[in-house]
Amino acid sequence: EHWAFDYSLDYAYNNLNSSLATDTRPYRNTILQSFTAKYSLSRFTAVARLLHSVYLNDEKEGEGSKNMRRLSPSFSLSYKLLQSHDLFIRASYKSIFRAPTFTESYYYLYGSRDLKPEITKQFNLGITWRQSFSHRMDFEATLDAYINNVKDKIVAVPYNMFVWTHINVGKVLVQGVDASILTSYHLNSRQTISLSGNYTYN
């Protein structure tokens, strides 16, 4: 079979209480729905995913932050370059939606109910090599280049000398390269020794 499909649904309830007189007891209902389609043919694999995020905010003693809804698509492609070796080239695009946390929205003096969600568009191009030198020893190396375009990034800034607050800062561009290696030695079926290293430049 070349096609595979998956659907998942997650629900979460969060609330915040404190002993402060200014506490309005905010709470949030979160609904996340994900639909994934995967297509495989010989050495080629493609995955498409659509995430629907719903954040319903309210307060027991006031007006909560704005409700948030977002459709976030993502796509990834992988191709095995050599039939007899695990050498893959990868490319991906992902839209990431991050709602403000309770601390960023409601924390005493620091929070802001007017925060917009943080939206990131992530582009990635990479290569992966895996090799088994014996039935006990495995090796994996990856190299990735990425670009992240962030809109309405949430950051903490000083409101005065003693108080900080959270704001959206418009657009942020992040570019970089990641390299990693992982070596594993299997002592037996239950015990493995691993050595890993990672380097990031941006």
Annotate each PLM feature:
Residues 25-31, 67-71, 119-123, 137, ...:
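Residues that define the transmembrane beta-barrel architecture of outer-membrane proteins
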Residues 1, 19-25, 36-38, 61-65, ...:
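Outer-membrane beta-barrel proteins
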Residues 76, 124-128, 180:
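Outer-membrane beta-barrel "beta-signal"
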Residues 2-19, 25-61, 65-124, 145-167, ...:
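Surface-exposed extracellular loop regions of Gram-negative outer-membrane beta-barrel proteins
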Residues 2, 42-43, 83-85, 121, ...:
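Short coil turns and loop connectors of transmembrane beta-barrels in diderm outer membranes
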Residues 43-44, 140-149, 167-202:
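Gram-negative outer-membrane beta-barrel transporters
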